[in-house]
Amino acid sequence: MENPSALPIKLQPSNLRPIAYRILSKKHGLNIQTDALKLLTDAVSYKFGFDWKSTQSQQFLEEIAKIWKKQDRGIFIDGPGLKQVIKELSDRNTNQISTRNGSADNLAKKAERSDTLVDNDAENEPVNNAENTLNWQDYFKVINPDEQPNYKYDKHRKQLSFIPSTNAKRLANNLNSNVDYFNNRYHLISDRLSRNENFQKPSFSSISSISKSLSHNNKTNEITLIKNVLGRDGSKFILFGLLSKNANDDFILEDSTDHIELNLTQAYKTEGSFYCPGMFVIVEGIYSASGGSMSNANVIGGCFHVSNIGHPPAERRELSMENYGNLDFMGINRDNDTNNNDNHILRVNKSLKKKLVSLEKTLVNHKLIILGSDCFLDDLKILDGIKKLFGKIESSLIDDETNQPLVIVLIGSFTSNPLTPTNSSVANVSNTENYKSNFDNLSNILSNFPNIVQKVKIALIPGINDPWQSSHSLGGSNLNAFPQRSIPKIFTNRLERLLPKGNLIAGWNPLRINYLSQEIVLMKDDIINKFKRNDIIFSNDLELEQLKLQKDKNDDGLIHATDINTKEPHISPKIKQARKLVKTILDQGNLQPFLKDIRIINTNFDYSLRIEPLPTILILNDATFPTFEVTYNGCKVINTGKLVGNNRKLSFVEYFPSGKKFEFKEVYF
């Protein structure tokens, strides 16, 4: 494309504007800004010189337009974005010149094949060099947060933008990520609500429909920004924002424009959810210009008397993926992409998705085994149970080689006491040695089962007692930063030497598994206790409890036949609590929907806590709650429970991806 004999010249933006308008604006529907036009003029002047009107120059603009559109950069071409696109194009062309002798035609074809965005249509595939053959192993990956692509919601363009990896070990939060943490959550949920038909602005097709609407006093569920309630005393509104507290310990609601004090004395909550500070909620009520405890010029005065409060409803995975343009949130296409640059957007096109779904339905023998929480390797009773389980798996592998699990996931904490430093240096060394010996014992057990060692991957997910965070958190979850990094290799090196290369997976918490078309999220946290401790108790809740206690007192604990509703199915308290937990997490679209004083978040990896779009499977590993399986908005959520309770019974779960089926199993030892 680049003519080596052409001498650079100095063009003015006005010279290139007609060509840029014809190609970028008229043909591709893009608008180039002034700074970008100047940058493009300089690039064309340097690359093509007196041949700036040639077909090669126009092809250069064509390629820029293709990449810009396929990267979803919006309709406005700005300077910084154009600079990045030109650099990527130049780097690619340089590699092609060295391998293909600089042929202009070959360069153009290569550019089309190696666009930074993989979004092939069905008619111009192949996807993986073979149109009708896919290797399932290419689409089975265990993904830690530092390997997961980072997409950030752009409130101006109303879409997700890819944030390139810095390839740096980000140990601590930076200022920007801390500031953007709640902003990102707000804008992402706000965008979800804008697609929900229950919160759409009214549309009228005729004057008669407007008159009919006014005559019937039809009310809409349009969400109002907090700044727009000022001066509208006594009016009814629906607001959306972050629920938190101010300096006076009063509840406030905050959105992107302002915050306002809430009066919750008459509030009725939507049943089936927890309501904690740090969650984004929808409130309905009446604004009063008086009555607020905070009265200064910097905030909206008065208070908002809430009548109803609820969560923003979750959106099904298929709809979210479609609205976000089928982005590759798991990076499964990265290894199959011809471009070596990791810092670019990838997509999972519909044709590939259909092939993956069809393929996974044929792999009926594939399964994942997830053990219960708190796999204390310093407990001899638990080691006996693990030995019994591994023996059972080994026997099944000998009887039927096709019935092998793809991965066995062990959930921490892997020690019953947190690994902490002590005043004595000798004791401190002893603590780490004891912790390392726990995994050495696991290696000794595994060495007796050669089929498991050779054929099955082992994944480790840390808990609150595992290093290195346990050294300062002392096993307390409120001081344990999330996401939690994997267990250091110094403790698992013997286990790593035993297993074939790549078969030991040192996972983070949370951890993601991509199985063909499915996204599986695993998190170890005793989260239901956090919800219960921080759940807001409304005045109406107390009144209902008092009425219930009074009724029980009057009836002397007797149940009358008239009180039994035979039409409604009986739901156990455990399932009610499980549904409440699942609905809260999925509606919030975040694994840790709390304020930072409840849970410390490493905001550099906050995107790994986002569950929007909803995952296919969410596996909670809460040792304080029994096992359950609940489906909400197409997302299946389970809890594995505790690995070993008071009896000699080891609990684990088998998941069969082909049918999305779980089997809760137990081994007695």
From Swiss-Prot:
Belongs to the DNA polymerase epsilon subunit B family. Keywords: DNA replication, DNA-binding, Nucleus. It comes from Debaryomyces hansenii (strain ATCC 36239 / CBS 767 / BCRC 21394 / JCM 1990 / NBRC 0083 / IGC 2968). This is DNA polymerase epsilon subunit B. Signal peptide: none annotated. Pfam families: DNA_pol_E_B. The keyword Transport does not apply. GO terms for cellular component: cytoplasm; epsilon DNA polymerase complex; nuclear replication fork. It is found in: Nucleus. GO terms for biological process: DNA-templated DNA replication maintenance of fidelity; error-prone translesion synthesis. Transmembrane segments: none annotated. Residues 96-115 are annotated as: Disordered. Heterotetramer. Consists of four subunits: POL2, DPB2, DPB3 and DPB4. In eukaryotes there are five DNA polymerases: alpha, beta, gamma, delta, and epsilon which are responsible for different reactions of DNA synthesis. As accessory component of the DNA polymerase epsilon (DNA polymerase II) participates in chromosomal DNA replication. Its main location: nucleus. The keyword DNA-binding applies.
